[in-house]
């Protein structure tokens, strides 16, 4: 069989073997793993492998087979396997068999696994046998020894591996037995290995790792002797062992013990002096410097933990910290952030502890720490500040942590903080240095200063903040910054973006200045200079377009300087030129917009707002400026519209260009409307009317284009606040064009319903709009039903299903808008009354559909509206609906509603298996049903109660329960009946 195993493994690993032969080989291999004969054959091959080498693939397979069978073995078999493994290892050592590392590790894992089964009762001499094997001090023996000991740690001591309670108990017994029988000998053997620096690098690193692993649960006194620690410390000066030595020392210093013992340990180890003896200044091994920083951090954290647990040791701990701080500062100030951030945990813990123990934070120490933090927040000399790479992102994260430290110091020592931050801001921004890194630090700290004032980190009485000296200092800095030539003299993206961000963020500070208007104009001039909106750097340019919009929107400057506004509008003309680009798809097939159009819209909105802010006395100028913006767009649209149908079809860029122009018109109107106190003159409305007409002409010429329909809807929604009732001359045509589109998408109709809901709300008192809605309601509802039906090939596509749910919700929200805006009469006019029954039926259908609970709940909400407005006689109950009195009652609606509402209210919770009131979504539906019943009771009175009584009796409800339900329905208010109904349903379903 051994020969067969050889052949099977060889075939299975072959890249050229026949597939059928390979399948047979795999089948045979699986059989070997699962049979006792196969296991024994593999053990035989393993035992011979010391004298008769086998290839790596076969050996790894044998290790796997043995590993998978250990758990199945009897005590006798375990003893035998343990003996055979030791014989094999002895043979490897005698014959200097040096397998690849992965095989040595796998073999060591076998020893570790069988150790767990034999050490307690079957073979307690396990370690003694290992000691015999390493007595020769051969490197191969020491290598296997250290690997086996490490593997045993992973089996029984690794605290990062989750284990069952049973395994944990077993491991505890194993550790107890080791402590009792072999701990001294083990620790001694490790010390002897460390005393020989000529041992191989792998052996020494493994041995250092072992000390770090086992010290966690062994007697620390065995390790903490001068000779033993000297053996470990020596490797801090050995290039190949120093990193592992740091990790070992971290584990030693981290061992849990009483506070006084831990303080004694820190003193004995004297790690600070050891580190001071190492020359790190010219060390180019960054990993080692990082590990030293980790070690320094751990010593500091351990001292702070001791102080938290035993405050009486303050003097001794403070003395140790005094020795440690120079190393902390050195690591914090290291040129590489990867080193600096390793002492962050200590700094954070220290500052938090200072809040509890103020005596810990001396003024001198915190002053030094704050200065180090500030210096560290500056960009490195080799950073260009332009590239958005991983290093920049990492620096931002580190900066954020440093800022938190700075904020904590501000809380601890407000005067120190204010003094330090004002010095750094003043020197960085106004010291004459044109180094962008220093200036950027000043901007960053100016922003931090304002945040500390806003969050009152310096603990001033709230009523005094705005009159405080720090607040006045900040305002002076801000004004000085705006009036300075700093941003002009230092041409760097970080400075430009930082400046614009600060002035936008702190616009409200400007309002407190007597020179507010001149400051705002100064900022607007900088925005419209080559440093802002026209910046050569695309990132700065696009960011400033948005910042410009935000600034204008937030400050709403009082502008009566027509020359200034005209200059802005004319100057911005080149930036307003729209050049559409077709979108592309990325590697994930997601659509990616090309060009800067979305950012351009901020400019259109800004200009709209600026023009609106001009005094009404300057109407001629306002009209002139609007023409300057609109005319190029009109010309563009005319070119698009005049293209032949074939060209429009073959060149999608034309429709994209038209879309962008329409969006620009709508966005300009939105900007003009930002000043909601504006009273729009007829001249302004005339201009927007022209724009609306152009939108309609464009839509007429692109009737099948979804992009154009979307842009037209967007624009009309923005024209409404300005045109008000004048919109109705365009609205009928617009709605007709949209609904007439034979390729209208579900998502489009969803958005269109939202637009119509806005129309219903804004024009609820307008007779012309009412008539328009009256004429479109039936075709609109038919269109909704057509697109939301579940028939067709696309009915099962997830995206389509989602879109249909959204359409149903939009439809019901639109119905709600009609009810709430006193227009329910629209449902029962001569034009629409035939469709009203379909509307109510659709609501019942949606209510029963629990596949999307939000749709069901919304449908029940609309049924409540139907009951409230049409229940009890079919006459509309809404005194504010001025058309209601002229319309006859809806015949038969009472009987229909009473029957269907009652059925729905009890069939939904009792007959739908998925209806579980423990689920929050179904509970909401249940609560909505209770409101539906309460609404009908209030509207239908005794007639409804009588019908309900008969229905519940037929349902099998006892008379007492029926009486209780009816009584509570009448006497409880809506809120309390909601609770009652949920309890009623829960109890009744629980009794079934």
Swiss-Prot record:
It is found in: Nucleus; Cytoplasm. GO terms for cellular component: cytoplasm; nuclear matrix; nuclear pore. GO terms for molecular function: small GTPase binding; tRNA binding. Keywords: Cytoplasm, Nucleus, RNA-binding, Transport, tRNA processing, tRNA-binding. Belongs to the exportin family. tRNA nucleus export receptor which facilitates tRNA translocation across the nuclear pore complex. Involved in pre-tRNA splicing, probably by affecting the interaction of pre-tRNA with splicing endonuclease. This is Exportin-T.
């Amino acid at each position: 069989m051994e020969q067969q195993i050889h052949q099977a493994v060889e075939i299975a690993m072959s890249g050229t073997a026949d597939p059928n032969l390979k399948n047979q080989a795999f089948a045979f291999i699986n059989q070997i793993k699962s049979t006792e004969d196969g296991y024994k054959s593999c053990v035989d091959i393993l035992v011979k492998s010391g004298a008769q080498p086998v290839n790596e693939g076969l050996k790894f397979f044998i290790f796997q087979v043995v590993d998978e069978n250990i758990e199945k073995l009897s005590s006798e078999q375990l003893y035998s396997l343990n003996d055979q493994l030791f014989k094999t290892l002895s043979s490897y050592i005698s014959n200097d068999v040096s397998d690849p590392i992965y095989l040595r590790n796998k073999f060591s894992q076998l020893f570790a696994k069988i150790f767990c089964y034999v050490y307690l009762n079957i073979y307690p001499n396990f370690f003694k046998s290992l000691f015999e094997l390493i007595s020769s001090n051969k490197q191969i023996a020491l290598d296997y020894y250290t690997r086996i000991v490490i593997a045993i740690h992973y089996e029984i001591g690794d605290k990062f591996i989750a284990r069952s309670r049973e395994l944990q108990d077993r491991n505890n017994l194993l550790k107890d037995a080791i402590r009792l029988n072999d701990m001294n000998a083990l620790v001694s053997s490790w010390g002897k290995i460390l005393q020989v620096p000529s041992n191989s690098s792998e052996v020494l690193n493994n041995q250092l790792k072992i000390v770090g692993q086992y010290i966690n649960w062994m007697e620390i006194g065995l390790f903490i002797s001068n000779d033993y620690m000297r053996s470990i410390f020596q490797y801090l000066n050995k290039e190949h062992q120093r990193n592992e030595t740091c990790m070992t020392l971290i584990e030693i210093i981290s061992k849990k013990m009483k506070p006084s013992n831990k303080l004694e340990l820190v003193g004995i180890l004297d790690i600070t002096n050891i580190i001071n003896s190492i020359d790190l200044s010219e060390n180019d091994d960054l990993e080692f410097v990082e590990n030293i920083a980790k070690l320094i951090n751990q010593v500091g954290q351990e001292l702070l933990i001791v102080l938290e647990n035993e405050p009486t040791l303050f003097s001794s701990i403070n003395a140790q910290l005094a020795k440690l701080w120079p190393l902390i500062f050195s690591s914090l100030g290291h040129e590489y952030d990867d080193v600096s951030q390793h002492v962050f945990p200590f700094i954070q813990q220290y500052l938090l502890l200072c809040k509890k123990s103020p005596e810990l934070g001396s003024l001198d120490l915190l002053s030094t720490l704050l200065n180090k933090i500030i210096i560290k927040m500056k960009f490195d000399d080799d950073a260009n500040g332009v590239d958005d790479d991983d290093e920049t992102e990492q620096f931002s994260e580190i900066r954020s942590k440093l800022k938190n430290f700075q904020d904590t110091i501000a809380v601890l020592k407000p005067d120190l903080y204010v003094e330090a931050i004002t010095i750094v801001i003043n020197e960085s921004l106004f010291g004459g240095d044109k180094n962008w890194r220093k200036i950027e630090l000043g901007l960053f700290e100016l922003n931090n200063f304002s945040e500390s004032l806003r969050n009152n980190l310096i603990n001033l009485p709230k009523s005094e903040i705005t009159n405080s000296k720090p607040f006045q200092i900040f305002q002076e800095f801000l004004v000085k910054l705006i009036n300075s030539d700093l941003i002009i003299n230092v041409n760097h993206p970080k400075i430009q973006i930082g400046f614009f961000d600060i002035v936008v963020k702190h616009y409200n500070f400007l309002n407190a200045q007597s020179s507010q208007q001149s400051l705002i104009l100064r900022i607007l001039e900088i925005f419209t200079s080559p440093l802002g909106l026209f910046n050569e750097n695309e990132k700065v340019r696009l960011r400033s377009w948005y910042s410009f919009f935000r600034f204008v929107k937030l400050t709403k400057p009082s502008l009566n300087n027509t020359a200034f506004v005209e200059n802005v509008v004319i100057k911005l003309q080149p930036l307003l030129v729209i050049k559409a680009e077709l979108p592309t798809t990325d590697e994930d097939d997601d659509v990616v917009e090309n060009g800067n159009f979305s950012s351009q819209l901020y400019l259109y909105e800004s200009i709209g707002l600026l023009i609106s802010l001009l005094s009404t006395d300057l109407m001629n100028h306002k009209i002139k400026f609007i023409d300057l913006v609109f005319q190029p767009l009109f010309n563009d649209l005319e070119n698009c519209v005049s293209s032949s149908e074939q060209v429009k079809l073959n060149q999608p860029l034309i429709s994209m260009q038209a879309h962008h122009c329409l969006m620009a018109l709508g966005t300009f109107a939105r900007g003009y409307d930002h000043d909601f106190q504006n009273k729009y003159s007829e001249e302004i409305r005339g201009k927007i009317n022209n724009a609306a007409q152009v939108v309609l002409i464009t839509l007429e010429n692109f009737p099948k284009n979804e992009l154009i329909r979307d842009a037209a809807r967007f624009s009309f929604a923005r024209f409404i606040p300005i045109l008000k009732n004048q919109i109705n001359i365009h609205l009928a045509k617009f709605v007709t064009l949209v609904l007439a589109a034979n390729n209208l998408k579900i998502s489009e109709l969803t958005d269109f319903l939202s637009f119509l809901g806005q129309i219903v709300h804004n024009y609820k008192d307008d007779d012309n709009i009412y008539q328009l809605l009256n004429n479109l309601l039936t075709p609109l509802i038919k269109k909704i039903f057509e697109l939301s039906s579940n028939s067709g090939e696309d009915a099962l596509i997830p995206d389509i299903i989602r879109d249909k749910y959204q359409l149903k919700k939009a439809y019901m929200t639109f119905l709600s808008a009609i009810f709430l805006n006193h227009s329910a009469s629209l449902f029962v006019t001569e034009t629409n009354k035939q469709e009203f029954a379909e509307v109510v039926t659709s609501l019942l259908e949606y209510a029963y559909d629990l596949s999307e609970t939000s749709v069901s709940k919304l449908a029940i909400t609309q049924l409540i509206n139907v009951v409230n407005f049409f229940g009890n006689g079919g006459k509309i109950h809404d005194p504010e609906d001025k058309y209601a009195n002229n319309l006859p009652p809806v015949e038969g609606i009472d009987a229909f509603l009473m029957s269907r509402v009652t059925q729905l209210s009890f069939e939904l919770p009792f007959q739908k298996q998925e209806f579980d009131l423990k689920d929050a979504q179904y509970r909401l539906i249940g609560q909505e049903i209770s409101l539906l019943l309460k609404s009908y009771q209030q509207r239908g009175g005794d007639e409804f109660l009588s019908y309900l009584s008969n229905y519940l009796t037929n349902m099998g409800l006892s008379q007492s329960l029926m009486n209780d339900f009816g009584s509570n329905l009448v006497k409880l208010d809506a809120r309390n009946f909601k609770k009652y109904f949920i309890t009623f349903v829960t109890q009744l379903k629980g009794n079934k």
